[in-house]
From Swiss-Prot:
Protein name per UniProt: Guanylate kinase homolog
UniProt superkingdom: Viruses
Tagged with keyword Metal-binding: no
Molecular function GO terms recorded: guanylate kinase activity
Coiled-coil residue windows: none
Lineage, highest ranks first: Viruses, Varidnaviria, Bamfordvirae, Nucleocytoviricota, Pokkesviricetes
PANTHER family reported in the protein's UniProt record: GUANYLATE KINASE, GUANYLATE KINASE-RELATED
Domain Guanylate kinase-like span(s) in chain numbering: 1-141
InterPro entries the record matches: GK/Ca_channel_bsu (IPR008145), Guanylate_kin-like_dom (IPR008144), P-loop_NTPase (IPR027417)
Length: 151
C-alpha cells in the first residue's frame, strides 16, 4: 500500500504538469493512468544531507534519469518469467484480471527493453526473492562504500 509522505508525495495532475513544465523534475512518466516523477528538490535535499536515493522507476524513468546531471547506478530486478509476474500479481489480490493482463504485457515490454545497452549497470535475476534482495543490499553497500571512499 502506497503511503502519502512515505512512498510518494501526492499532488493533483495540474500541479505535477506545472512542475514538469517548470523543470522541477529529474524524470517523470505516466504509468497505468498515474503520473510519477522525481523532484529535483527531493534529490538535492537528500544529497545535502549525505543520503543516497534509492528509487523504484519504470524503464522510461530510468532512461530519463540516466540523462541527468547525477551519476545514477541502475539495477534491474528481472523476473524469471512472465508467469512469475502474473502469479505475484494474483497473490496480491489487488487487481482485476484485465489489470493483471495489462501489467503482464508491460512487464514483457520492460524485460525486452532492459537489455538496452547502458540502461542498467546490473541485472539481478529474481529466481528467489530473498537471494535477489541480498544481492541488491550487497550492491547498495558496495556503492555506498565506494561513494564515501572517494568523497
Amino acid at each position: 500500500m502506497e503511503r502519502e509522505g512515505v512512498d510518494y508525495h501526492y499532488v493533483n495532475r495540474e500541479a505535477i504538469w506545472k512542475g514538469i513544465a517548470a523543470g522541477n523534475f529529474l524524470e517523470h512518466t505516466e504509468f497505468l493512468g498515474n503520473i510519477y516523477g522525481t523532484s529535483k528538490t527531493a534529490v538535492n535535499t537528500a544529497a545535502i544531507n549525505n543520503r543516497i536515493c534509492v528509487m523504484d522507476l519504470n524503464i522510461d524513468g530510468v532512461r530519463s534519469f540516466k540523462n541527468t546531471y547525477l551519476m545514477p547506478y541502475s539495477v534491474y530486478i528481472r523476473p524469471t518469467s512472465l508467469k512469475m509476474v502474473e502469479t505475484k500479481l494474483r497473490c496480491r489480490n489487488t487487481e482485476a484480471n484485465d489489470e493483471i493482463h495489462r501489467r503482464v504485457i508491460l512487464a514483457k515490454t520492460d524485460m525486452d527493453e532492459a537489455n538496452e545497452a547502458g540502461l542498467f549497470d546490473t541485472i539481478i535475476i529474481e529466481d528467489d526473492v530473498n537471494l535477489a534482495y541480498s544481492k541488491l543490499i550487497q550492491i547498495l553497500q558496495d556503492r555506498i562504500r565506494m561513494y564515501f571512499n572517494t568523497n
